[in-house]
Amino acid sequence: MNWDDMRVFLAVARAEGLTAAAPVLKMDPATLGRRVARLEAAIGAALFVKSPQGYALTDLGVQMRDRAAEAEAAFSLAI
């Protein structure tokens, strides 16, 4: 996972969906969906439960969100 993957993951997790995350990242929702799918394939596990109502984090997704948010905060303090 690289920094861009983490930013996409965090934005989708925080927005609870692709459509809401798209303007934050200035990306198309379909592109975000492909990025999330690629990340999940690389990890070998689902990070989100997808439904028409949005994206909800799986247990692994919650753990990853917490760690990614910690890394994001540490990075922000360092610069």
List the predicted regions and their residue ranges.
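The N-cap/first-turn positions of alpha helices
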Residues: 2-5, 61, 68
